[in-house]
A protein has these predicted regions:
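SAM-dependent Rossmann-like transferase core, predominantly class I methyltransferases
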Residues: 54, 64-165
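N-terminal auxiliary segments of SAM/dcSAM-dependent transferases
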Residues: 1-89
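Generic helix-packing signal
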Residues: 14, 36, 43, 142-146, ...
């Protein structure tokens, strides 16, 4: 079985199992690609169309690694991000676990495209991220505006523990 075959097989299994998407991926194929690449220790930006990867035969051990993660995803119904302990937002990886929700936010898109910039002025020196969860928006804001002091807070001590890992 090749990498391409395994991604297709994994996507079919996810679709047949009826798992939910939306915690980093929008469909079975994208989630399968993430699952397979993570399980095999390959970069998530691996070009699956590149024949040097896509046609490469996989060992039985590699297929078993993918099968273990796939089974955990289907049986637990947990977002893949919780199983891999990693979520990506605007191209930035964040640690995540069940103590905070998987980051996904329209605000992150606004930060990336600069549509919040007009609301800032030369007098903007501080930003507060309320209900920070895993801290991803605070990190993205600090990256977008390095001259602004960003503070993050949350009522949940568990969520703050996750945020500390990411900042």
């Amino acid at each position: 079985m090749t990498l391409t075959d395994l991604v297709a097989h994994t996507a079919r299994q996810l679709a047949q199992a009826g798992v939910s998407f939306g915690h980093g991926t929008a469909n079975a194929h994208d989630e399968a690609a993430w699952l397979v690449l993570h399980a095999l220790g390959l970069p998530l930006d691996t070009d699956l169309a590149d024949e040097s990867w896509s046609k490469q035969p996989l060992t039985a051990d590699q297929q078993a690694q993918v099968a273990i993660l796939l089974r955990a995803r289907i049986d637990s119904r947990q977002p893949l991000a919780y199983l891999t302990r990693e979520a990506w937002l605007q191209g930035v990886p964040f640690y995540v676990d069940q103590r905070a929700i998987v980051p996904r936010s329209l605000i992150a898109e606004c930060l990336a495209e600069g549509s919040i910039d007009p609301w800032l002025s030369a007098q903007t020196h501080r930003l507060l991220d309320l209900c920070t969860g895993n801290g991803s928006l605070a990190v993205l804001a600090a990256l977008a505006w390095p001259e602004v002091s960003v503070q993050a807070c949350d009522l949940s001590a568990d969520a703050l523990a996750v945020a500390r890992i990411n900042v």
